[in-house]
């Protein structure tokens, strides 16, 4: 489900999506975010839609490609919902994966519980973690809870079970009911214990109350403590005790506006700063240019524009996301209504876009090799071209990084207002199969090609990341 749509048309709704620092009288910006396991903090998330991922469209079709994903370099595999899909009021020909008919079941089109156990085992054998999408805000209309526990749902003034927003294919759950909370916590514990999962991604996590998430996290810490919880939302208070990371929708919207020429490059910095100042210290955000709610970045920005956008996601602080197919330049429709159909990723397109797999492999490898790019503090660098050029440094104990990205579809020049001594160019050369970075010494005066990007590194200044 998509939060951005909730904010698109009204400033009032925007405040629901990007809250002020004050939460229930507490300024959460003065607090510290809960600690996150190292494998997640240093990781790269790979979102998988099993229906679209392979020709067979099931869990085994995912597992069979694990060697490819290991080679790509991702380490957190996020499976979009694998539960049976509701038939009543369904959207499209196959329905939304976010309309869950059975919280304890696996979509028969995806396989069996044994298939999921095999998937997790094979992922762990390759050093990859597995998280599953959990939809706790609403259910399908033919979920058994509708009849067994109608009191679990929100009702309108006439006593009818209602739905959230304009999502007519789902029924809205009511977390003022303590028995619903218990049901959901027990359900999550089942998936963790039965399948050895490494965490969850929670759909529209901003709608259930924060105190439920805190209650659930406290209970599930006793089941498996070293896990990763990702919230589809951007509500600051959730990262104090419950969630490990959330979405950065405001930054994503700023990126779209900048890349489409509707805002200057400075909008990226302004959005980042706004969230940084309002969230708990050390809060993590997932960084994305593409996901299942969007038209493909390559369709919105073109080939070089999509790579430049993802270069920003790989080098800015937070945890970068790769949505399946991005790494080959797939253009298959992914958001609604395509989400409700049986559309496959066109993997052979990689042969015509070899720069895409090279970019993804090499940028992920670069991020892995650099403490600064994984964990370093962000220091924004002023430059003389505020319209097109984004520039910032990342500082860590072992190394520093300098990143320069041209957000415009024309070559641009800029002077960087920072000391560049000691920085050397490590930008992956994606034009050639076995090309190495140039290693050239950085200059404060740069000319950057259309949608171009540069990454420089130098030995660490001794500044440990404060966040």
Question: PLM ranges: what are they?
Answer:
Residues 19-78, 84, 117, 122, ...:
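Carbohydrate-interacting/catalytic domains
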Residues 8-18:
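Bacterial N-terminal signal peptides
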Residues 78-92, 133-142, 203-209, 232-237, ...:
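Short, solvent-exposed turn/loop segments enriched in Gly/Ser/Thr/Pro and often Arg
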Residues 313-331:
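Substrate-binding cleft of secreted/luminal carbohydrate-active enzymes
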Residues 24-29, 33, 193, 203-285, ...:
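Active-site-proximal helices and loops of the catalytic beta/alpha 8
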Residues 182-210, 287-291:
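Active-site groove signature of glycoside hydrolases
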Residues 25-46, 50-75, 81-195, 215-224:
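Substrate-binding/active-site clefts of carbohydrate-active enzymes
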Residues 44-46, 77-79, 130-132, 200, ...:
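Hydrophobic faces of well-ordered beta-strands that scaffold small-molecule active sites
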């Amino acid at each position: 489900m998509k939060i951005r749509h909730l904010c698109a048309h009204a400033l009032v709704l925007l405040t629901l999506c990007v809250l002020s620092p004050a939460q229930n009288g507490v300024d959460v910006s003065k607090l510290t975010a809960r600690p996150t396991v190292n494998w997640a903090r240093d990781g790269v998330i790979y979102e998988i839609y099993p229906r679209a991922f392979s020709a067979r469209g099931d869990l085994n079709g995912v597992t069979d490609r694990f060697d490819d994903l290991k080679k790509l370099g991702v380490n957190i595999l996020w499976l979009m919902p694998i539960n049976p899909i509701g038939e009543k009021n369904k959207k499209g020909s196959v329905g939304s994966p976010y309309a869950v008919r059975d919280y304890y079941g696996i979509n028969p089109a995806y396989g069996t519980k044994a298939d999921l156990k095999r998937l997790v085992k094979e992922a762990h054998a390759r050093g990859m973690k597995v998280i599953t999408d959990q939809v706790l805000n609403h259910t399908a209309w033919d979920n058994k809870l509708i009849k067994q526990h109608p009191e679990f749902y929100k009702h309108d003034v006439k006593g009818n079970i209602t739905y959230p927003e304009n999502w007519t294919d789902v029924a809205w759950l009511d977390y003022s009911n303590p028995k619903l909370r218990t049901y959901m916590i027990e359900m999550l514990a089942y998936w963790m214990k039965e399948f050895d999962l490494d965490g969850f991604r929670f759909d529209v996590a901003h709608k259930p109350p924060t105190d439920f998430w805190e209650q659930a996290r406290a209970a599930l810490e006793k089941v498996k403590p070293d896990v990763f919880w990702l919230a589809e939302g951007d509500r600051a208070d959730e990262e104090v005790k419950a969630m490990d990371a959330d979405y950065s929708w405001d930054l994503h919207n700023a990126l779209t506006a900048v890349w489409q020429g509707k805002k200057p490059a400075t909008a990226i910095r302004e959005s980042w700063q706004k969230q940084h100042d309002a969230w708990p210290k050390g809060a993590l955000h997932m960084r994305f240019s593409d996901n299942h709610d969007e038209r493909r970045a390559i369709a919105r920005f073109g080939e070089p524009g999509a790579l430049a956008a993802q270069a920003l996601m790989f080098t800015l602080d937070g945890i970068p996301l790769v949505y399946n197919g991005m790494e080959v330049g797939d253009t298959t429709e992914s958001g609604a209504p395509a989400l409700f159909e049986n559309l496959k990723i066109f993997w052979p397109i990689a042969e015509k876009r070899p720069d895409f797999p090279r970019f993804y492999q090499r940028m992920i490898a670069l991020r892995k090799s650099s403490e600064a790019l994984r964990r370093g503090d962000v220091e924004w660098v002023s430059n003389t071209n505020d319209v097109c050029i984004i520039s910032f440094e990342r500082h860590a104990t072992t190394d520093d990084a300098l990143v320069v990205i041209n957000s415009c579809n024309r070559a641009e020049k800029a002077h960087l207002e920072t000391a560049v001594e000691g920085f050397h160019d490590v930008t992956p050369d994606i034009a050639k199969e076995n090309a190495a970075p140039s290693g050239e010494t950085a200059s404060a005066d740069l000319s950057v090609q259309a949608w171009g990007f540069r990454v420089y590194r130098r030995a660490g200044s001794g500044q440990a990341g404060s966040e």
